[in-house]
Amino acid sequence: MSEVRVKENESLDSALKRFKRSCAKSGVLAEVRKREHYEKPSVKRKKKSEAARKRKFK
């Protein structure tokens, strides 16, 4: 979990902005979206294969 300590004379907005940035950098939101619904292993393999194919042809 990301943790941000509010500095002296720092506004809440800037602390919140730093917190959001640290969450995005650590990949918390992406992980939450990925785990939101169960995905069968066969579907995971298919998506991974499709992504590799798209990268190859770009």
UniProtKB/Swiss-Prot annotation:
GO terms for molecular function: structural constituent of ribosome. Residues 35-58 are annotated as: Disordered. GO terms for cellular component: ribonucleoprotein complex; ribosome. Keywords: Ribonucleoprotein, Ribosomal protein. Gene3D superfamilies: Ribosomal protein S8. It comes from the Bacteria. Residues 43-58 have a biased composition (Basic residues). One of its GO terms (biological process) is translation. The keyword Aminoacyl-tRNA synthetase does not apply. Belongs to the bacterial ribosomal protein bS21 family. This is Small ribosomal subunit protein bS21.
